[in-house]
Every structure is written in C-alpha cells, then in structure tokens.
Amino acid sequence: MNHTPILNKKNLIWIDLEMTGLNLENDRIIEIATVITDKYVKILAEGPSIAIFQSEEQLKKMNSWNIFTHTKNGLIDRVRKSKYNEKNAMIDTLKFISSWVPFGKSPICGSSINHDRLFLSKYMPDLEKYFHYRCLDVSVIKELARRWKPKILSKLKKKHTHKALDDIKDSIKELLFYKDTFIKLN
C-alpha cells in the first residue's frame, strides 16, 4: 500500500457505512470507512475508519439484528465512546479522499452502494457531492452471477463482520473474484 497520496483522476473511492437501520427518515450513520484503489482495483490506501457518536435514544431504536451484530463486532461500544459527529467524520473523510482523487472523478464504489449514497446525501451532503454521479456497485455483478452462473457463488468467501472497512475489503475481493471467474478479462 502506498502511504504517499498521489492525486489521480482514475483512482476509485470505495466507501461503506454502517447505520442504526435502513430507514432514511429515522436511522443514522454509526460508522464510515473509505479505501482508495487504482483503476485495476489494487488497494493504494485505507482511509480513516470512523465510529460516529449517536445518543442512547438513537441506539435504542435499532432492531434486534443491528443490536446483536454491532454489539458482537464492538461497534456500539466504539460509537458510545466516539468524539466524532457526522460533520467531523465527513470533513476527515473528505480530507483523505481529496488527496487521492479529484472532485467529481470517481464513481461511488461498494456493495449495495445506492443506499449508502442516500444516507450520505442526507447526513454528509458535501461528501456525497464529491463523487461522480455514477456508481460501481459490486452487488449488480453478484445479481448477474446469481442468475447466469450461480455455481461460482459457492466459491466466494466473505467475512461478514459488518465493520465498514472489512466490508469494503470484502467488496473489493468480491469484484476481483468476479473478474477472474465470471467476467474473465484477459
């Protein structure tokens, strides 16, 4: 991994959010992470992985799956102790990505990324605006593989930690897996 930022319009910004739930009107972001890759999806740098403070009232609104998952992975404890709010997390994330990719050049990259984009639009609008309007969504390829070549999916191994940085790395590995087994680029 390169630790010296090199601004390149072909670099890709990968992002993942963990939220208290999926309802845009009632739920909030509790973690954000970013990774920069080159155009061949080689990881160049990992951005900050930031737990975002939310009140106990907000945390109590989570459903049982979220409570279980984010207690098990330690995120709820990190959220309770965090000094970050959404604005500070957005500023630090923008500082990181802007040293690697110019404004408006990278699609938003990840898995099921449109839902994350909705939360960014509401809670971190300056960050959402930084991305190109297009997206690179690994879930689209997964859905095609599920329909056209389902046997390959049994070979795909993911961590499923529901930690933002781990989820990004899983998405990158998944895309590379599809490149080798499904898309088969030479």
UniProtKB/Swiss-Prot annotation:
Any one Gene Ontology MF annotation carried by this entry is: nucleic acid binding
The cross-references to SUPFAM superfamilies, in alphabetical order and at most eight, read: Ribonuclease H-like (SSF53098)
- Where does this one sit in the cell? Cytoplasm
Q: Which GO terms describe its biological process?
A: DNA metabolic process
Enzyme class, one word? hydrolase
The entry's keywords: Cytoplasm, Exonuclease, Hydrolase, Nuclease
Q: What name has this protein been given in UniProt? A: Oligoribonuclease
Question: Which species is this UniProt entry from?
Answer: Wigglesworthia glossinidia brevipalpis
Source taxonomy? Bacteria, Pseudomonadati, Pseudomonadota, Gammaproteobacteria, Enterobacterales
The gene that this protein is the product of is orn
